[in-house]
Amino acid sequence: VKVGDALFVNKNCPEVQFASPVSGEVTAVLRGDRRKLLRVVVKADGEQQYASFGSCDLSSLDGEGVKAKLLEAGLFGFIFQLPYGVSTTPTTTPKAIFVSAFRDMPLSADFEVELRGEETNFQTGLSALSKIAKTYLGISAQQTNAALTSAKDVEVTVFDGPCPAANV
């Protein structure tokens, strides 16, 4: 498989695919009770190979076009519905999208480090999500990265306090 190739699909919504994070060979598919998929093991090869999805002009896409691109790239399955945390379906139009860039849990990623060098890509992603529904970005009062504090096309909300201050 290549990075971005579909590893499996949502059985209730087959157009929602889940993409491989690495290129290599699928070595195991582990299932639990009632054949619940627990894990797909991909042995990474030496050099990453990427599936091509082509490029597009974001300004020419509407919300449905963004959904189509997310489906094609295998990324749509990572959008969850609240309050139950289940994958959403492409036919559902959300009232709002919440992006959490707030570090309040121990051992969680530092968004200042994670975004370094990827600010333009991050903004493109936020702009794409905002075409689907009103988008909110939650950040920490301590964050100084301009990609977070001055994000465009979203409503930025600043949180402060210990876990679970910014639960989404």
What is the predicted role of each segment?
Residues 30-168:
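Buried, small/hydrophobic-residue-enriched core segments of structured protein domains
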Residues 10-21, 35-39, 50:
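Short, Lys/Arg- and Gly-enriched loop/turn segments at beta-strand edges
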Residues 1-4, 13-28:
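Generic structural motif
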